[in-house]
A protein has these predicted regions:
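Terminal substrate-recognition subdomain of acyl/acetyltransferases
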Residues: 1-13, 34, 38, 98-218
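Conserved glycine-rich acetyl-CoA-binding loop
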Residues: 77-88
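Eukaryote-skewed repeat-based solenoidal scaffolds used as protein-protein interaction platforms
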Residues: 87-98
Length: 218
């Protein structure tokens, strides 16, 4: 059956909707999901056979004049369809960005706790931080801006792009093939103390000409 992806205003979610989101056995409990409803503008769901397989809370806005897609929370059911669901949710994010910011380069940012979830950003350019690169200057400044917007700047370490006690939301995706994660990427994430609440702030760019392709409805 086809994947059905739908976006609504987050404020329109009912208690039943939130309970359903909590039932996919992802990383977030009902309290955290309810807080995301308050913090973010858009709520996107992905269904197969009318069964919820994933959701996103996000906002499209400008930071310092630059168009941004802020993925405040994403969670995907651990099923054989997880890769398809991830592609669908990211495709919807790109589509919304294309509608809001046509002909502009756009920053896409989120928080991560595992390296395999970074597959979500495989269509982005200049993903930061990245193994083997040393982010400086404006690159680090973008990390600070996003940490502040995510509300995790109080204990943010700019050189590592790590926010302590920052798990109010992140991109919750577990790959079917975690063994394929490159050792250098796993090493980059080794600085996180995930049980203590650490997250890594990661962002990338989609150029205007690429966004036209990524944001097209299939």
């Amino acid at each position: 059956m086809p994947l059905v992806v739908h976006t609504n205003d987050a404020v329109s979610l009912t208690d039943a909707d939130l309970d359903e989101m909590g039932s996919i056995e992802g990383a977030f409990d009902i309290g955290t999901i309810s807080k995301a409803k308050e913090d973010w503008v858009l709520a996107t769901t992905a269904r197969i056979d009318d069964k919820l397989h994933g959701f996103t809370f996000s906002t499209l806005e400008r930071i310092g004049g630059t168009p941004c897609v802020l993925l405040g929370m994403m969670s995907i059911r651990r099923s054989s369809k997880r890769d398809q669901v991830l592609r669908g949710l990211m495709g919807e994010a790109y589509h919304r960005a294309l509608m809001a910011f046509p002909d502009e380069d756009v920053v896409v940012g989120s928080r991560f706790v595992t390296p395999d979830a970074l597959i979500a950003f495989d269509k982005l350019d200049e993903v930061t931080p990245s193994p083997g690169t040393n982010a400086v200057g404006e690159e680090r400044e973008w990390g600070r801006r996003l940490a502040k917007r995510f509300g995790v700047d109080r204990k943010y370490e700019a050189t590592l792009f790590v926010a302590r006690e920052g798990q109010t939301g992140f991109l919750d995706f577990a790959s079917n093939t975690p063994e394929k994660v490159k050792p250098a990427l796993a090493e980059m994430f080794s600085v996180l103390n995930v049980p203590a609440g650490d997250v890594m702030v990661v962002y990338g760019w989609t150029m205007a000409e690429d966004l036209v392709k990524h944001g097209q409805r299939s």
